[in-house]
Amino acid sequence: MTPTSITPPKRAAELRQLLNQAAHSYYVLDTPTMEDAVYDRLYRELLNLEAKDSSLLTPDSPTQRIGGAPAQGFASVQHRIPLLSLDNAFNVDELTGWYVRLAKLLGHQTNPKTPQPDLSMVGELKIDGNALALSYEHGVLIRAATRGDGANGEEITANVRTIASIPLRLQLVHPPAWLEVRGEAFIPNSTFADINTARGKRGDVAFANPRNACAGTLRQLDPKVVASRQLDFFAYTLHLPDNWQAKAHDPARPMNQWAALQWLQAIGFKVNPNTALLADLTAVENFFKLWDEDRHQLPYATDGVVVKLNDLQLQETAGFTQKAPRWAIALKYAAEEAPSKLLRLTCQVGRTGAVTPVAEFEAIPLAGTSVSRATLHNANRVSELDLHSGDTIVVRKAGEIIPEVIGVLRELRPAGAQTLKLPHICPECRSDLVREEDEAATRCVNSSCPAILRGTLRHWVSKGALDVDGLGSKLIEQLVNRGLVQSIADLYALEASLLASMDRMGSKSTANLITALQASKSKPWHKQLYGLGIHHVGEVNAKALAKKFPSAATLATAACKAPEQITSVFGVGNEIAQSLQQWFATPANQQLLAKLKQLGISLEANEDELAHDTDQNQRTVSLEGQTFVLTGTLPTLSRSEAQALIEASGGKVNNSVSKNTSYVVAGVAAGSKLNKAEKLEVTVLNQEELLKLLAS
């Protein structure tokens, strides 16, 4: 009971301080200062006080770590300061290259024949978790968000409050008006094992690795589920207002990264203890070698080390590229490799009929994941590996994500082992497989193949095509397996009563799907063309073709009778022209188009599209023949808006960078496309430069 000499507000404040300090000692310092029974008694006392008087409830109360109803979803929020990713180095040479570039940028003299100049660095472990941005106002946690695209993330404050190692109130007497902390949420290995054991007992599928489990947990709508998984957090970056200086009883403002880590620890955060102050490049290399060897002894997953310039003022001088700070780099561990016994070769059939060989082998742990399958890409790769039954193969996770077979230990091959060859018949429909002389891919050419049909349907309803919400892979599989759908057109003849009888289809979802199918009939002609899934015709080419040929009829006539009209379209070559000719000349496809027309799908540009194209053609075309690639998040333009502006001026937007790319338009958190552009010396524009180019 609250002592009579202390008012409820004072007692509540006292309890908050006692409980928060006890939690900090237990979860952050790992030095318990309060017995569990005492903590529970004080916690209940605070809970009772807050229940009697809601005005005593504050955001930093320990009772607010878990509570509230499950969320309906997560709002997108803009980061005060962009949460950028880091550039990667995969070997010492790439690390040295980064170090030399940074030294030159900072005005240090460099010479390949002499030792590199000394730059004070801080080495930190790269925790394999999920980056978080924590926002504090006047010392109280007011928002937590995921990285997202670097400029905007998802607001997950209720979930992050459940992480005991994240303080709800900072240990500062005079906190700044705002403060930003960045760090990594993660699930320790032992906790991850316990989670998967519990999931196994419930019959749930096990998480593949701690990182995936952490990401999925942070996006749970119910904070109680998040709390049950006991996430942890290491802080590693601090942002303070430029004019803020510490007052009495608070630690001085840090002037370098090493001091910033100590400052974060002093105000209540958990900081990874395995950091080091590194005097020069040799020290950086030694730090990496140490943890490359010892990382498996750690109680959490790490996929490399992060090296940061120590001096914060020099960090500011070095600045940022479009997607990453110049003053930091992540040095990644080499991809893990492991041997396993090959069990069999199987095949997967894609939408175009392409057959992808897959190696199935005894499950092995690899880079935190259990792996038992890896793609072999095509028949050429199978021949190169010369796979035999019972072979011991070497599997690697490329970029620690995608499993691939990189070799065979022939000295371990069993006596009398038989050469493994790809099947000559389709595993789905038992039709003969075909391989063209100039192609590496083997294909099923049976248009009625269930695998091709499933892929065709998925493509037709995909976001880039007709965008039919509610028609997912599971429902498509049911419809195909039951023989209810044999073509795209059959989707539009499905009755509500039939759809409602499918697994997980209620009356509401059925009604929504019927509405979505009807709405898809009026989608633009270029989306319909792309949705047909004609080999080699992607979104960009479909848009260009639809602009030149305003209907399926005019396109078919040109494809079959005047292919030179097809190749006159910018970006369309002989390969696409031949593919169009073959597609439109196929009787089954002609029947499909006729049936779609009968069902109300126009397969031609409507008046608005024609008017838009006419308006564009009347403009002065300034970017004819220029190709663009968009990457990252632009300040005010969405990607679709930027693409529309470029295309309105006669330019073309592609998805990948090549030596033929004219410009790469890069925003915040630009990815590998920017790296490739710099390597190929392609001109890189920001949004302002793009708009100037368009205006000219």
Curated annotation (Swiss-Prot):
Annotated BRCT domain residues: 618-696
Annotated residues that bind Zn(2+) are located at C426, C429, C444, C449
Q: Which SUPFAM superfamilies match?
A: BRCT domain, DNA ligase/mRNA capping enzyme, catalytic domain, Nucleic acid-binding proteins, RuvA domain 2-like
Question: Which Gene Ontology MF annotations are present?
Answer: DNA ligase (NAD+) activity; metal ion binding
Keyword Aminoacyl-tRNA synthetase (UniProt): no
Check the record and name the Pfam families matching this protein.
BRCT (PF00533), DNA_ligase_aden (PF01653), DNA_ligase_OB (PF03120), DNA_ligase_ZBD (PF03119), HHH_2 (PF12826), HHH_5 (PF14520)
Task: Please list the cofactors this protein needs.
Answer: Mg(2+); Mn(2+)
Similarity comment: Belongs to the NAD-dependent DNA ligase family. LigA subfamily.
What is the recorded name of this protein?
DNA ligase
Q: Which organism is it from?
A: Prochlorococcus marinus (strain MIT 9313)
